């Protein structure tokens, strides 16, 4: 049986919010079966819980944010969400003492490190997957995103299109099949990126206040400003993949199917996920409970403990 997963024990980290610039303390705590991913604002009295849910994503300006009916939010959850998806974590409490998840180094890798540090515990309940049965497509101008049936696991085909000297001659398309490819190896270290020409405006809107060369790839009109350059040749498109993985994990389940997109972003990713979930005949929940069942997606499995 492919089982649900949580952590063996709790772990804590401190960082800076990308947009708020505020110091944030974040704690991961194990959660019981069928809990899902739940964000907890511990700086509020009483503590406010915001479960990961596609319908609760109410702000997608430069990040993905969960916002409840009272306006309480947890922003910039996409990189952590991608790490949880990549590690196959089903149940977790994420405590934060601020309205934003810390940006760390701008990728999912520091979150992966924290999860690996304490280890994963398999739980005594079957892991549920969302399997795509019918194709779904959403558009916004020339941008589009779509799901297609793909029974062998989860496959991504994503293309970006930036008109900038750094992108010229660089591969802006990436195709990965996660039935064999590892999220940790292929995607997790790709950092968020931005342009110097946008920063002054963003900061005037109280955004990107915590952004720096330590947690983002920054480009001027001609080149990458980070002294160490890029972590891989296709870091830009792979970071967009990372964002999409995090955005699509707002359904709290891994997806069995193919995701294709052109110039997508947080808003379009969420729009696609909502369109899928609203069309009940387009998907089904499946489990793998037979003896010796194999997961259709390659998850990190070092140091697993069975609950």
UniProtKB/Swiss-Prot annotation:
The keyword Zinc applies. Transmembrane segments: none annotated. SUPFAM superfamilies: Ribosomal protein S5 domain 2-like. The active site is at 266 (proton donor). Its EC number is 3.5.1.108. It catalyses: a UDP-3-O-[(3R)-3-hydroxyacyl]-N-acetyl-alpha-D-glucosamine + H2O = a UDP-3-O-[(3R)-3-hydroxyacyl]-alpha-D-glucosamine + acetate. Catalyzes the hydrolysis of UDP-3-O-myristoyl-N-acetylglucosamine to form UDP-3-O-myristoylglucosamine and acetate, the committed step in lipid A biosynthesis. Keywords: Hydrolase, Lipid A biosynthesis, Lipid biosynthesis, Lipid metabolism, Metal-binding, Zinc. Belongs to the LpxC family. Zn(2+) binds at residues 79, 239, 243. This is UDP-3-O-acyl-N-acetylglucosamine deacetylase. Pathway: Glycolipid biosynthesis; lipid IV(A) biosynthesis; lipid IV(A) from (3R)-3-hydroxytetradecanoyl-[acyl-carrier-protein] and UDP-N-acetyl-alpha-D-glucosamine: step 2/6. The keyword Ligase does not apply. It comes from Aeromonas salmonicida (strain A449). Its cofactor is Zn(2+). GO terms for biological process: lipid A biosynthetic process. GO terms for molecular function: metal ion binding; UDP-3-O-acyl-N-acetylglucosamine deacetylase activity. GO terms for cellular component: membrane. PANTHER family: UDP-3-O-ACYL-N-ACETYLGLUCOSAMINE DEACETYLASE 1, MITOCHONDRIAL-RELATED.
């Amino acid at each position: 049986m492919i089982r649900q997963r949580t952590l063996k024990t709790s772990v804590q980290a401190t960082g800076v919010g990308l947009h708020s610039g505020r110091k944030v303390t974040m704690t991961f705590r194990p959660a019981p079966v069928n809990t899902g991913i739940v964000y907890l604002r511990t700086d509020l009295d009483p503590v406010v819980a915001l479960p990961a849910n596609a319908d609760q994503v109410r702000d997608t300006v430069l990040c993905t944010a969960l916002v409840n009916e009272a306006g309480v939010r947890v922003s910039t959850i996409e990189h952590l969400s991608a790490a949880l998806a990549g590690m196959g974590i089903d149940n977790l409490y994420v405590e934060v003492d601020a309205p934003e998840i810390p940006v760390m180094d701008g990728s999912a890798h520091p979150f992966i490190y924290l999860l690996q540090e304490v280890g994963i515990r398999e739980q005594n309940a079957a892991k549920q997957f969302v399997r795509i049965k019918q194709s779904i497509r959403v558009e916004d101008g020339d941008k589009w995103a779509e799901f297609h049936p793909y029974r062998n696991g989860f496959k991504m085909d994503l293309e970006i299109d930036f008109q900038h000297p750094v992108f010229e001659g660089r591969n802006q398309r990436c195709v990965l099949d996660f039935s064999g490819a590892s999220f940790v190896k292929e995607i997790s270290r790709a950092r968020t990126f931005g342009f110097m020409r946008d920063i002054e405006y963003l900061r005037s809107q109280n955004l990107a206040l915590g952004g720096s060369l330590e947690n983002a790839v920054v480009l001027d009109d001609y080149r990458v400003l980070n002294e160490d350059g890029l972590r891989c040749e296709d870091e830009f498109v792979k970071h967009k993949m990372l964002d999409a993985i995090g955005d699509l994990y707002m359904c709290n389940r891994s997806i069995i199917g193919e995701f294709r997109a052109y110039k997508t972003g947080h808003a379009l990713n969420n729009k696609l996920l909502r369109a899928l979930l609203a069309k009940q005949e387009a998907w089904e929940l499946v489990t793998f409970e037979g003896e010796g069942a194999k997961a259709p997606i390659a998850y990190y499995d070092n140091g697993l403990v069975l609950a």
